[in-house]
Amino acid sequence: MIKKEFISDWTKEKIGLPADAPLTREALEAYQVKKLRETVAMAKKNSTFYGRLFASVDPERDIMSTKDMQKLPFTSPADLLAEEEGLLCVRPGEISRIVTLETSGTQGKPKRVYFTKEDQELTTAYFWIGLHNMADDTDRALILLPCRRPGSVGDLFRIGAERMDVFTIPYGLPGMRELERGNKGNGRGETFKQELEELLKLMAEKDVTFILGIPGQVAALAQLWTEKRAEAQDPLIVERLEKVKASMRTVLLSADYVSAEARNAIETAWECKIFEHYGMTEMGLGGAVSCYVLDGYHYREADLFFEIINPETGELVKDGEYGEIVFTTLTRKGMPFIRYRTGDRSRFLTEPCPCGCILKRLERVGPREK
């Protein structure tokens, strides 16, 4: 059974509230202030980069409320590119995974984000908790994100899903086989289409009820289903395609902007619920996710602190106003990020969510500027 209140209960446990106590903004913000102080102090002590950046900062004196974070300088992807290991707060031997992100700047030098085993467990736990809002132990989840390497995003999702007894089908990122064969096209050639056709067969064979994937790829899969269904004459093919639609209940889109066209293609094909996830590698992969109301994203306030700033002035905007998302990690040990500018545009939704959860909501995040 889907447990819609699970994320609130988990947050209460994370911040140290008794099970019978209500989750309040006051309790949550007191926890965040404590964690912000601890994070800044830990980073200042253990990181050469943060040691320089926060040389004049005394967390116990300077961070008395969450609003005091605006006194601290920003960090950015440029700092990660320039410093890399200077942001580390643990010995290299404590790092269990390094994620490399290609960039267009600094002559194509990649960004590298470092995680300890404990950091990755935070992500797995978040995936596990978030899934309680949209899936249960009757689901059969097709994972269309990288999942072959231990600790990859799809692998962490698999572990989280299996903790709640969801049957998982770790497939990987569609289109990778085309690239492995040397086709450097746009990922929409005949080989890619053939792979999508194979995926539709797999969905029917495995009674897939849930898909996790990138918006454009899941939309392409749904569009192909629509085309195949419109032209199908063979009763066996019709039966297989209808079986896919009858089984599908939920799609979780992640890793990219969700366009209206992508949503429409999926809804037209399968008439299923579409949840959206917002995150980035620097956040620890998981950032914020739709609740069952499907209006904005609740963000993981026990692990992250979000601010919305005016990108021109760097000043905080009022709740409800648009600006750039800035985040600080509260529980990361290997490579914490403090007031990290994402370049993503959104706003905090000020109306209470009908789901009853008090965790702050972001409006749907727009496409990231290149």
Where do the model's predicted regions map?
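Nucleotide 5′-phosphate-binding alpha/beta core
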Residues: 1-102, 108-133, 205, 246, ...
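Active-site glycine/GP-rich loop and adjacent strand/helix microenvironment
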Residues: 1-28, 34, 38-39, 164-370
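Conserved S/T- and glycine-rich ATP-binding loop of Class I adenylate-forming
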Residues: 43, 103-106, 141, 211, ...
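Short, compositionally biased "basic patch" segments
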Residues: 94-109, 153-167, 200
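Generic structural marker for isolated residues within well-ordered, non-membrane alpha-helices
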Residues: 100, 128, 158, 211, ...
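Alpha-helix N-cap/loop-to-helix initiation residues
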Residues: 120, 149-151, 192, 259
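N-terminal Rossmann-like or analogous alpha/beta NTP/dinucleotide-binding catalytic cores
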Residues: 126, 153-160, 179, 184-188
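Conserved AMP-binding loop of ANL adenylate-forming enzymes
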Residues: 131-168
